[in-house]
Amino acid sequence: MSDITAAQTTLQQAQHIVFMTGAGVSTPSGIPDYRSKNGLYTEHHNAEYYLSHAFLAEHPLEFYQYLQSNLYYPDAQPNVIHQKMAALTQQGRASVITQNIDNLYGVAKTAQLVEFHGNLYQVYCTKCGQHVDWHEYLKSPYHQTDHGYLRPNVVLYDEGIASANIERAVQYLQQADLVVICGTSFRVYPFAGLIDYRNPKAQVLAINAEPLQLPFAFTMVQQDAVDFFEGVQV
């Protein structure tokens, strides 16, 4: 049995899986990642500033235009990675903690989901607090009702993670018998720090085309994630 087949078998047999995922899960769906050679941070100088609370506060229209031009991919669809993970959550065997804000796990009907950094497609008015359909947001950054400024419910640089998301993520990890890291370099905190709350008996797998260097014991599965999940039976 190959290492990859063994890892797929481990995944199929586990009963309390936690998937910890990042932008690499959505690149097969046509959404660019952030830190690769062709990623947003490489292509755009000062991208972290453009995605900060400071830029939003100082230049709200430019912030809106930047998000609209660079982060929204409304025609993107879930790929086999999202689909297999979602199927496992629907069976009650898994949960997903993701850094992704692209809503593809929601489209895939993921049952147990923590969108740690929020969701671009959940938009609200900063004046009245009302939720607004994202289609309206892509037409205008101002609320038709009270002309308040609209923004997506995502965590910008200089903003904190919602405590409810932290609590749910920790709860999932404490119950895990298997943690699967996929599509992330696992260097962004506090997301990467969540691993410290895992069940001490949980096995950790990392699925990535390139080897990862992580400061804890784990099994490296060096394979493209699409190929890996195509071989997973759910």
From Swiss-Prot:
Main location: cytoplasm
Enzyme Commission number, as recorded: 2.3.1.286
Sorted UniProt keywords: Cytoplasm, NAD, Transferase
Residues that, per the record, bind nicotinamide: 101-102
Subcellular location: Cytoplasm
Catalysis performed (reactions): N(6)-acetyl-L-lysyl-[protein] + NAD(+) + H2O = 2''-O-acetyl-ADP-D-ribose + nicotinamide + L-lysyl-[protein]
Residues reported in the UniProt entry to bind NAD(+): 23, 27, 35, 99, 101-102, 117, 184-185, 208, 226
Domain Deacetylase sirtuin-type: 1-234
Keyword DNA-binding belongs to the record: no
Active site as annotated: 117 (proton acceptor)
Pfam families assigned: SIR2
Gene3D superfamilies: SIR2/SIRT2 'Small Domain (3.30.1600.10), TPP-binding domain (3.40.50.1220)
InterPro entries linked: DHS-like_NAD/FAD-binding_dom, NAD-dep_sirtuin_deacylases, Sirtuin, Sirtuin_cat_small_dom_sf, Sirtuin_class_U, Ssirtuin_cat_dom
Family the entry assigns: Belongs to the sirtuin family. Class U subfamily.
Protein name (database record): NAD-dependent protein deacetylase
Organism: Lactiplantibacillus plantarum (strain ATCC BAA-793 / NCIMB 8826 / WCFS1)
